[in-house]
Amino acid sequence: MPTKPKAAKTPTKPATAKAGATLKSAARLPLARLPLEGLLVLDLTAHRAGPTAVRQLADWGADVIKIEQPGEEGHDATGSSRHGPDFQNLHRNKRSMTLNLKSPEGKAVFMALAAKADVVVENYRSDVKHRLGVDYDSVAKLN
C-alpha cells in the first residue's frame, strides 16, 4: 500500500545568521564590495548608448567621472534638461566635470586624468576623436 507523503515541518523558531545576532551587531558588519570598486572610468559619451553602458559600470561600483563640454549648463548634449528624470537616470552614480577638450588647458587636464584612469569610454565620430586627440592610440600612450 503506498504511503502518504508527509507534510513539511514548519520551523518553530525563525532562522538567524548567527546565534545571538542583533540588528545592532549586524549594523557593524562591513558592506560587501561592488565588483568594479576601485576602478576609475572617464566618460566622454553622449546620447543614449554610451551613457547607458557607462551607467552600468557606475552601478557596479566604478568611480565614473563624466566629462562634459562647456556650455551645456542646464542641458546635456541632446538638449535634455539635466534635472529631468531621463538625464538623472542615465548619469546616476557618476561624478561630473566640465572640460574644454579643444583648449590646451582642458586637454592637459584630460590627459592627466587619462594617465591615471583604468578605462576611457567615448562614442565620438572617428574624425572628432582624432581631432580632439582622445582616440585610442593617443590615450593608450599615456596609460
Residue ranges and their predicted role:
Residues 2-143:
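N-terminal helix-loop segment corresponding to the beta1-alpha1 unit
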